[in-house]
Amino acid sequence: MKHSKKVWPEFFQKILDGEKHFELRLADWECNEGDTLMLQEWDPTTKDYTGRTMEKEITYVIKTKDISFWPKEDVEKYGYQIISFK
């Protein structure tokens, strides 16, 4: 399945340059490993697409609502951080 999502220019460029290998998104849509993520560069100042796009294969999905490693109070105090590595 293919999913289209907006990406702000600074993040789009980091993905394009190979520096960013993850997306943090609201889990209000269903995606699975093997799906295709079509990223469309979106400029929030002009509120329009720039025309640049790229496709990436989804290799791993974790939904934070399902994570119960930490107490709710700690999550509310500190939040989550997504760490990318290679």
Residue locations for each model-derived region?
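Catalytic phosphate/metal-binding cores of nucleic-acid and nucleotide-processing enzymes, i.e., regions
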Residues: 1-86
